[in-house]
């Protein structure tokens, strides 16, 4: 069963709305063909500057949108929401590193400007400067999808120090196997139960394989992640 799918839109750039919303419409065709109640996962298209500065949105507000940019963002997001709902799908918004919605105040702004639900991604939230557990407490009423990831903050510090970009962050292994990084996943699952969440949980480990690394290594990593979930989260 399809639980969701990534639908990037350059919300703050009206010149790209026609192209991006047409692509969203084609993606919704695939959702409809698959059946079920998959969630369109809206993500901001970001910019070259944000992609060159992963994790910096939480500490440098100059990388963010100005007021005109936020007005365009709100209008673009409204159009995407209407398109999804007109086709029978309830969307969610994914705060994601290297986009214009990464830091806690950027997430607050999206929730203030729209009625869209929120996807809580433990990895991207931590990279952007949010506490995933506090995110559930602050935004729990809007959460309608969850991504479980773990993150190595030592890798993030190196990426920021070296002014490395998003692809380099992935290649360095910023996202790691569950239980081997710095996300308090045990505490997160405890809070997830406390807020009564009963929706989809998607387990992810974003990575870029080396040329000499077989695809089977990714499969083995997911088996280890599955074992961690059974032991620590009872899933």
Per-region residue spans from a language model:
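Active-site acidic/histidine proton-transfer and metal-coordination neighborhood
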Residues: 1, 11-118
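A broad structural signal for short, well-ordered beta-strand segments within beta-sheet-rich domains
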Residues: 1-2, 143
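Short, charge-rich amphipathic segments
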Residues: 4-17, 63-74, 120-129, 150-169
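Active-site beta-loop-alpha junctions enriched in small/polar residues
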Residues: 6-11, 45-47, 96-98, 123-125, ...
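Histidine-acidic metal/acid-base catalytic patches
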Residues: 29, 78, 82-85, 104-108, ...
């Amino acid at each position: 069963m399809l639980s969701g799918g990534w639908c990037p839109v350059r919300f703050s750039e009206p010149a790209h709305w026609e192209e991006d919303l047409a692509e969203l419409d084609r993606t919704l065709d695939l959702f409809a063909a698959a059946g079920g109640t998959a969630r369109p996962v809206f993500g901001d298209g970001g910019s070259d500057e944000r992609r060159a500065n992963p994790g910096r949105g939480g500490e440098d507000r100059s990388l963010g949108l100005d007021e005109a940019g936020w007005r365009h963002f709100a209008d673009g997001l409204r159009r995407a929401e209407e398109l999804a709902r007109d086709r029978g799908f309830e969307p969610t918004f994914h705060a994601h590193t290297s986009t214009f919605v990464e830091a806690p105040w950027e997430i607050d702004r999206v929730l203030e400007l729209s009625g869209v639900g929120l996807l809580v991604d433990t990895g991207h939230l931590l990279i952007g400067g949010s506490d995933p557990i506090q995110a559930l407490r602050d935004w729990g009423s809007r959460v309608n999808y969850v991504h479980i990831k773990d993150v190595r903050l030592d890798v993030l510090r190196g990426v920021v120090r070296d002014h490395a970009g998003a692809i380099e962050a992935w290649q360095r292994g910023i996202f790691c196997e569950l239980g081997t990084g710095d996300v308090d996943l045990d505490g997160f699952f405890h809070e997830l139960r406390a807020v009564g969440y009963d929706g989809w949980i998607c387990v992810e480990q974003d990575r870029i394989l080396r040329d000499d690394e077989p695809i089977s290594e990714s499969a083995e990593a997911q088996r280890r992640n599955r074992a961690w979930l059974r032991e620590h989260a009872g899933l």
